[in-house]
Amino acid sequence: MLGSRRLRSPALVLLLLRPLLASGDSASRLQTRAMNPGGGERGSPEDSHRLQRSTVPGSDPQRSNELLLLTSREGDSPEQRHHVLYFPGDVQNYHEIMTRHPENYQWENWSLENIATILARRFPNSYIWVIKCSRMHLHKFSCYDNFVKSNMFGAPEHTPDFGAFKHLYMLLVNAFNLTQNGMLFKNRSVWNKDCKASNCESNPSTSNGGQKENERTCEHVDEPSMSFPPLSLDGASFTLIGFSKGCVVLNQLLFELKEAKKDKNIDAFIKSIRTMYWLDGGHSGGSNTWVTYPEVLEEFAQTGITVHTHVTPYQVHDPMRSWIGKEHKKFVQILRDLGMQVTSQIHFAKETPSIENHFRVHEVF
């Protein structure tokens, strides 16, 4: 349980993200929001954040994603090799964008930045990567078009040859190469709790949804130089996490396993995946929320990856989407029958299903 941890708040380095400067009361709320699982405040005032936006290409120049990297500045060492890859769900976006949305502001506690902080506490001494969807329909529906064939609202159509594994592998290769070349620190914009709105200017940029958003860029802020060891895939290990809509990426990876293993580099990457977490998976399609095809799961069982599923009544007890709970049970049962190491837990079972508890699964998994 994350709520029982008493970890020192890390000094955070956030890279590959558009500069986000909240002003006035909004900035104050962001600075004082501490990620204290189980309730209370979120965002610790002693945390200093550096935020950058960058687009990292994947398997080809037309397939790229924005990445958010978070690592502890104090206590890091070149020996750290574990990486947590997180795929967000619907409505999750950068904090400033969420606070300005007429509906999504309600869930600003679960912005990409805040989730990265939760994961840093959940997985200490690990690099945390948030992989943003390439398209956000109506600024609400996350669409992982680079990983799986999707409809307008991001519901997937799974195939064995879309290239999700290749895209994910190349995203990491290219991002790691940027750290080796020192590119992540060149011409960086810095978001700092002491940076004032007067030091920033708004520039138009095109959002993933094809609509214009304001990109705020801070002027130079004096910061101590960063000591950041170059990242390497050699000897690295990985944990993959999908939340809600983000689980479609994990599902697509399962469909591609058999073919992906034929590539020696991707096969080596697959062998470096230690654990996969499905957090309350769901999407707007009428089926295939969970993978239930025995032949696909048989291939998955051969990997030896540890599986964790954490669900809430919001998804698995929804009477209007009864297939979700049935598919979840079947997914878990088939994997157990195949001898995989699987844990499955339902949270907030005695509480009324709610979107808030759906998001709170981040605090209790």
Curated annotation (Swiss-Prot):
Residues 53-64 have a biased composition (Polar residues). It is found in: Mitochondrion matrix. Residues 1-24 form a transit peptide. Its main location: mitochondrion. Residues 28-64 are annotated as: Disordered. The keyword Mitochondrion applies. One of its GO terms (biological process) is oxidative phosphorylation. Keywords: Electron transport, Mitochondrion, Respiratory chain, Transit peptide, Transport. It holds the Pfam family C2orf69. InterPro entries: C2orf69_mit. The keyword Transport applies. GO terms for cellular component: mitochondrial matrix. Belongs to the C2orf69 family. May play a role in the respiratory chain. PANTHER family: MITOCHONDRIAL PROTEIN C2ORF69, UPF0565 PROTEIN C2ORF69. This is Mitochondrial protein C2orf69 homolog. It comes from Mus musculus.
